[in-house]
Every structure is written in C-alpha cells, then in structure tokens.
Amino acid sequence: SELAKYFSMPASEIKNCRTYGGHGEQMAVFASTTELHGKKLSELIGTQIPAGDWEALRQRVIQGGKHIIDLRGRSSFQSPAYLSIEMIAAAMGGEAFRWPAGVYVHSEGFNHIMMAMETSITKDGVHYNAVKGSAEEMKTLEESYKHLCQLRDEVIAMGVLPPVKEWHALNPNID
C-alpha cells in the first residue's frame, strides 16, 4: 500500500512486491522484484522516486507491524489470518500460494533457519527457491539471516531448542 499511496495508483497495478528474511527491523525489502505499470521499481529509484523518498518508504514497510501496534494498541491478526487461509487452501489442493512465507531453509548459504523465502505452497508441500536480487538487497538478506541465527542460538542457549546438530534426531527430514 505504501507504493500505491506514493504513486497514486491502484495496488492491483503493482506486481511482485517482496520482503524476505526476518520480520521488522531485519526485514529485507526488495525493489528489484517489484513492477509498477510493467516498469521495475529498482529502475525508478533515483528518477521517478528520489532515493531519499525510497528509503523513507522502505522504512515504513519495515516498521509497518510496529505502526499497527502503535495505532491499535495490539497487533493486527486479520491480514495474517487471511493469508493463513490462503496457505491452507493451497495445501489442500487449491490455487498455489506463491508469496514469500516462512520456511525451514538449509541451502543457498542459509542453513538451519526459519525465514521468509520465495515459496510455493501446494498440496505437495512447501518448496522454496533461491532469492534473486541486487547486491545490496542480497547483503540486507544476509544481515537478516545472521540476525535470525543469533536469535536461534539464543533460544538454543536457553535450552528451549536442542543444538542444531541434534535436530535430525527430532526430525529425520532435517539434515
């Protein structure tokens, strides 16, 4: 909705907006995947959208959840609930869910972590693909991954989760 507001255009004309990695402060917002009227957002930054405006917009996206809590005094459950229904429908054989979603990742340089990736949820399960973006976007995603690893390791240190090397004993599908 931030792009729709900024460009005064219907959200339906904005395609393939993507955020990956963690949530909130560590979210990786990708401009290179997004298209407005068939033009790449990354090509519009610095011309039709000044770099400073893009950075402010990107921060509003990152802070979106916090903003909802500030306004309501609680988190919003409607949007995640709606997306959950779409995911369940896809898993039950409906139309595939093809938005970034949290998934267990152990490849592409991201190991033993739950993070938002490019996914496809179908009746056959959840599959993810390597994320493609600019060098700067990939650096932001790497930083998000490192932050998530720190959080994972803190939870392991508290004894809530076993060490990563023991995860296979709990779930043979985890290498």
PLM regions and their residue ranges:
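Short, flexible loop segments at boundaries between secondary-structure elements
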Residues: S1
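Long, compositionally biased stretches enriched for glycine and/or charged residues
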Residues: A4-D175
